[in-house]
Swiss-Prot record:
S-adenosyl-L-methionine binds at residues 29-40, 69, 90, 152. The lineage of its organism: Eukaryota, Metazoa, Chordata, Craniata, Vertebrata. It is an enzyme of class 2 (transferase). This is Thiopurine S-methyltransferase. Keywords: Acetylation, Cytoplasm, Methyltransferase, S-adenosyl-L-methionine, Transferase. Its main location: cytoplasm. PANTHER family: THIOPURINE S-METHYLTRANSFERASE.
Length: 245
């Protein structure tokens, strides 16, 4: 694993067992949207993505970009406006509808025949498709392969016991020459149960190391006042670029 030089010294906690059995249900995630408990949403977009956008896109046009657990991420509109094709998956129908409404985008919806009760929402422009379903049901649908994956708030939200299955699905969606941008969080997992969950370097290497080159682009202190209620006194975001070995 190749680490970028940084002034931030991040303590790694080898004992991550404290969170390994933590489980949030799909209904609990839906309730967070209904109750407006979406502190993870960034109205101005993700600053590290903006900073490293050229590294991520590498000058390519008309890419297929996948957003796992997309919520109403404003970056989906950014990529679509640049001519890329965006596909996302999100369990909250409310989150998806809010995305289209807040971005002033007209859209259509239709059932996903392979997944009972699921729907796909498509922008009228045709270059944004958001699947409202359980991410782990997604392999039942042929959504194609992707040139880029922007994983922010996804791996850190997946129940720790599901990470291997999640990673297998993500990698199954990649095209040759893919670039996968991954944002994770470091904090003391003995003080906060998650989500977002603590994902150490060793876990990333374990999940992606056999198939991907792993490069840490940046580490940033993202501690805010709201984090005090979590019982922690620091939180660091790490941005990784994963590429094909």
């Amino acid at each position: 694993m190749d680490d970028a030089s940084t002034l931030i010294d991040v303590k790694e906690y080898p004992d991550t067992e404290v969170q390994k059995n933590r489980v949030l249900t799909l209904e609990e995630w839906r309730e967070k949207w209904v109750d407006g408990k979406i502190g993870f949403h960034q109205e101005q977009g993700h600053q590290l993505l903006k900073k490293h956008l050229d590294t991520f896109l590498k000058g390519k046009n008309v890419l297929r970009v996948f957003f796992p657990l997309c919520g109403k991420a404003v970056e989906m509109k950014w990529f679509a406006d640049r001519g890329h094709c965006v596909v996302g998956v999100e369990i909250s129908e409310l989150g998806i509808r809010e995305f289209f409404t807040e971005q002033n985008l007209s859209y259509s919806e239709e059932p996903i025949m392979e997944i009972p009760g699921a729907k796909v929402f498509k922008s009228s422009s045709g270059n944004i498709s958001l699947y409202c379903c359980n991410l782990f049901d997604l392999p039942r649908v042929n959504i194609g392969k992707f040139d880029r994956i922007w994983d922010r708030g996804a791996l850190v939200a997946v129940n720790p016991g599901d990470r291997k299955c999640y990673t297998d699905i993500m990698l199954s969606l990649t095209r040759k020459g893919f670039r996968y941008l991954l944002a994770v969080l470091s904090y003391d997992p003995t003080k906060h149960p998650g989500p977002p969950f603590y994902v150490p370097d060793a876990e990333i290497k374990n999940l992606f190391g056999s198939t991907c080159n792993i490069h840490c682009l940046e580490k940033v202190d993202v501690f805010e006042e709201r984090h005090k209620s979590w019982g922690i006194d620091y939180i660091v975001e790490k941005l990784y670029l994963l590429t094909e070995k």
